[in-house]
Amino acid sequence: MARKKIREYDSKRLLKEHLKRLAGIDLQILSAQVTQSTDFTELVNQQPWLSTMKLVVKPDMLFGKRGKSGLVALNLDIAQVKEFVKERLGVEVEMGGCKAPITTFIVEPFVPHDQEYYLSIVSERLGSTISFSECGGIEIEENWDKVKTIFLPTEKPMTPDACAPLIATLPLEARGKIGDFIKGVFAVFQDLDFSFLEMNPFTIVNGEPYPLDMRGELDDTAAFKNFKKWGNIEFPLPFGRVLSSTEGFIHDLDEKTSASLKFTVLNPKGRIWTMVAGGGASVIYADTVGDLGYASELGNYAEYSGAPNEEEVLQYARVVLDCATADPDGRKRALLIGGGIANFTDVGATFSGIIRALREKESKLKAARMHIYVRRGGPNYQTGLAKMRKLGAELGVPIEVYGPEATMTGICKQAIECVMAAA
């Protein structure tokens, strides 16, 4: 499962659309998204309620505590909303130690209310955890002792009996409506492959549940079966994260393939770089370098998996090598081409793409005094390793090659010793 956060606008859009389909509950929520490209005149023409109702506006940027941070404006008309957005759009704010400009807002009707409820659903390994409280809102953390929680195993349906402990202390007249709402939201959660969903708070308007603030995460590995249900969904980067041009290139490449291609620059001046096969292995290599005390020298995080073809690996490796060899300073550098023992990825084929990239970047590798350490196993690995050994001799670039007889992370220590040596 790959949990990906989505904007509040999309969370509410999905809930409104599919709660009616799955549970017959017609949420009366309205919302509009505002970005740099928004024309307010056109927006109001498309959504006339914006000019007839009092409004709420807030950033929709995947960070919480917006109310406590003074980033939520209440009871405005559309002209005031426009001014609020104008003053803050593109302005950098700091949240949770991360700084980034605000680029996206959500605008909704202002809903006066007295009661605030809390609801969250979290996907766990063996089922789902559902939490509910009658004391929702910005003080939910201070009132966490009042939150009721149940665990629903994967094979169990959300029945009235299962839901009963959550709503047991509600007034009798409210239990049916809120219980049906919780069951309906859970149906949407499962049907659309949400991995996390939170409403803090939701309230009751004209006798019906009404989400005021909402967060959602989807399991993006389920996109293949949900693309029609999700519609034009966006998976924004985490707040404060901006892709470099090289990272953006790999991100676009990853979007176009059934394989997985990931690349993040951690320290452009780092002297230890990785190009690792497998999601688990890639983390192990990075952690090992850190555990040995050299996290500050780690240049990147990189992972390829899911049997990418030779051309995809070639494009991927070019980017990694360009970053790893940039701005040579006379000191040694190391590249870890590692991985575990593949089950189905043709090691010979993926290494062919890497070898082509290494040939192209020969002069850069030498200028950067790059030492390469290879460890891999799996289908056709002997062919791949033999090609790597031959390449080292041809290029005159130091390449040490190991198969599954060597420990997976042994090359990390060798790389560190190499770059830290005086010569």
Curated annotation (Swiss-Prot):
<keyword id="KW-0547">Nucleotide-binding</keyword>
<dbReference type="GO" id="GO:0006629">
    <property type="term" value="P:lipid metabolic process"/>
</dbReference>
<protein>
    <recommendedName>
        <fullName>ATP-citrate synthase alpha chain protein 2</fullName>
        <ecNumber>2.3.3.8</ecNumber>
    </recommendedName>
</protein>
<dbReference type="Pfam" id="PF16114">
    <property type="entry name" value="Citrate_bind"/>
</dbReference>
<keyword id="KW-0808">Transferase</keyword>
<comment type="function">
    <text>ATP citrate-lyase is the primary enzyme responsible for the synthesis of cytosolic acetyl-CoA, used for the elongation of fatty acids and biosynthesis of isoprenoids, flavonoids and malonated derivatives. May supply substrate to the cytosolic acetyl-CoA carboxylase, which generates the malonyl-CoA used for the synthesis of a multitude of compounds, including very long chain fatty acids and flavonoids. In contrast to all known animal ACL enzymes having a homomeric structure, plant ACLs are composed of alpha and beta chains.</text>
</comment>
<keyword id="KW-0444">Lipid biosynthesis</keyword>
<keyword id="KW-0067">ATP-binding</keyword>
<keyword id="KW-0012">Acyltransferase</keyword>
<dbReference type="GO" id="GO:0005524">
    <property type="term" value="F:ATP binding"/>
</dbReference>
<feature type="binding site">
    <location>
        <position position="345"/>
    </location>
    <ligand>
        <name>citrate</name>
    </ligand>
</feature>
<dbReference type="GO" id="GO:0005829">
    <property type="term" value="C:cytosol"/>
</dbReference>
<comment type="similarity">
    <text>Belongs to the succinate/malate CoA ligase beta subunit family.</text>
</comment>
<dbReference type="Pfam" id="PF24948">
    <property type="entry name" value="Citrate_synth_N"/>
</dbReference>
<feature type="binding site">
    <location>
        <position position="343"/>
    </location>
    <ligand>
        <name>citrate</name>
    </ligand>
</feature>
<dbReference type="InterPro" id="IPR016102">
    <property type="entry name" value="Succinyl-CoA_synth-like"/>
</dbReference>
<keyword id="KW-0963">Cytoplasm</keyword>
<dbReference type="InterPro" id="IPR032263">
    <property type="entry name" value="Citrate-bd"/>
</dbReference>
<dbReference type="InterPro" id="IPR056749">
    <property type="entry name" value="Citrate_synth_N"/>
</dbReference>
<comment type="subunit">
    <text>Heterooctamer of 4 alpha and 4 beta chains.</text>
</comment>
<keyword id="KW-0443">Lipid metabolism</keyword>
<feature type="binding site">
    <location>
        <position position="376"/>
    </location>
    <ligand>
        <name>citrate</name>
    </ligand>
</feature>
<dbReference type="GO" id="GO:0003878">
    <property type="term" value="F:ATP citrate synthase activity"/>
</dbReference>
